[in-house]
Structure formats: structure tokens, C-alpha cells
């Protein structure tokens, strides 16, 4: 079988499965809250997959590189596509909303691609050896979107949902690609 199957990458795979379930929950527009839960599960799994993978002392360079690549591919679905599907299911379905969602997904793609290039060139480390990141991490949407969604539902802001979500997706997208 192609690929690698150690604990860290299995967490990444589970994150993808959670997001695919979340995407399927948005298709009929009625299970948005479950899709939000799937997004949060993916965020939690993503928070630990790298840490778990780094505990493997005997990982080959190929396994490490595979883990980086598969994590970014998974992050694209989990924190790019799934949030956009949630936004669409929440009513962002006009042409200008779709343009905003497309820009959000594009920004996530650019951010993840840039991260991979910098990681491969080992340019994500400062002079003291500390790792750092540029731009807002795409996983942050797993915190931001549930909070905004909860405020909309329970804060009686549903009449403003389109504007609030549009601004949130634009701000997150610009955050992804900003220095």
C-alpha cells in the first residue's frame, strides 16, 4: 500500500474523515451544527498530529516529508473547503458570497503552499532555532467559525448572518496571506 501509517499521520487521516463527514452534513443545509462539530474535531486532531509525529525518533526523511505534505492536503479540505461549505449552507449563496468563499479557499491554498515551500527550504526557523509561522494559520478557522456561528445562533444575530460571515471569511482569508 502506498503511504505511511504511523500514529501522527493516522490522526491526520481521521481529521480528513471528520471533515468529509462535515461536508456531507452541509449538503442538505440542515445539519450545520454537526458540520461545525466536525470542523472542531478536525481542529483538535490537527493540533496533535504534528506533536505525535515528532515523537517518532526513527522517522525517515521520506516519512517526515510525507507527513508535511499530507497534513497540508488534509488542511485544505478541513480548513479551506469545509468552512466554505458551512458558509454556503448558512446562506452565503449569492454570487458575491460565492466570490468571498472562493477567495477564502484560494487564500487557504496559497497559505498552505507557501508554508510547504518554506518548510522544505527550512525557512520557518529563526536564528535561535525556534519555529515560526507567517500569516494566520488556516486551522484558526476551527476556533473562529464555531464562535461566530454560536454568537449568531444564541446572540440573536441571525438577521446579520450574511454580513457577519462574509466579513469573517474575508478577514480570515486576508489573515492567511498577510505577513
PLM regions with names:
Residues 46, 105-118, 168-179:
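Transmembrane alpha-helical segments that form the membrane-embedded catalytic/substrate-channel core
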Residues 125-179:
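C-terminal membrane-associated helical module and adjoining short loops/tails
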Residues 49-65, 114-131:
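Cytosolic, membrane-interface loops and tails of multi-pass inner-membrane proteins
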Residues 6-13, 34-37, 69, 73, ...:
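Alpha-helical transmembrane segments of integral membrane proteins
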Residues 2-6, 30, 62, 66-69, ...:
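Juxtamembrane loop-transmembrane helix junctions in multi-pass integral membrane proteins
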